[in-house]
Curated annotation (Swiss-Prot):
Family: Belongs to the isochorismatase family.
Name used for this protein in its record: Uncharacterized isochorismatase family protein PncA
Example GO molecular function: hydrolase activity
Organism: Bacillus subtilis (strain 168)
Classification via Gene3D superfamilies: Isochorismatase-like (3.40.50.850)
Pfam families: Isochorismatase
């Protein structure tokens, strides 16, 4: 079965210590795991999706405006990939198996062409990494489940600012949507 890695929201605003909506140290601690997974998938010729939250400054109609401070604003460094993932992406961005996509909702599937890209490549297994485990990773996983994809969540490559939410989401992945939670 063909597989893809979906790396979700691993950006400065979500991970850096001065990020606008940072998950803090837990997010920074998974950098090596995310970079290594990304390298592995690229080297093996598997599809790699970098799904990045993207917002317009001052968008009063977006539902997140009422929930969170402005973050991942188009044209800001906050929206850039975090740490060593950025130069890795820049090195491989023109390769056909590397896809950078913007998303405006929690799920990488909502309002995007992600499902089309995966189906065109006959991909049936999705490996998930990134932040936050209990928000965007969770919503992407549930949508993937509802679309019939096999799901693998890499426990060492997901994090959240909310440790209870993180633990709950890991349990939910395994027990409610049948995902493999890989150590």
């Amino acid at each position: 079965m063909k597989k893809a890695l979906i790396c979700i929201d691993y950006t400065n605003d979500f991970v850096a210590s001065d990020g606008k909506l940072t998950c803090g140290e837990p997010g920074r601690m998974i950098e090596e795991a995310i970079v290594n997974l990304t390298k592995e998938f690229i080297t093996n010729g598997d599809y790699v999706v970098l799904a990045v939250d993207s917002h317009d400054e001052g968008d009063q109609y977006h539902p997140e405006t009422r929930l969170f401070p402005p973050h991942n604003i188009k044209g800001t460094e906050g929206k850039d990939l975090y740490g060593k993932l950025l130069p890795l992406y820049q090195k491989h961005e023109h390769e056909p198996n590397v896809y950078y996509m913007e998303k405006t909702r929690y799920s990488a599937f909502a309002g995007t062409d992600l499902e089309l890209k995966l189906r065109e490549r006959q991909i049936g297994e999705l490996h998930l990494a990134g932040v936050c485990t209990d928000i965007c990773v969770l919503h992407t996983a549930v949508d993937a489940y509802n679309k019939g994809f096999r799901i693998v969540v890499h426990k060492q490559a997901v994090a959240s600012f909310n440790q209870e939410g993180h633990a709950w989401a890991l349990s939910h992945f395994a027990n409610s949507i049948g995902a493999q939670v890989a150590e």
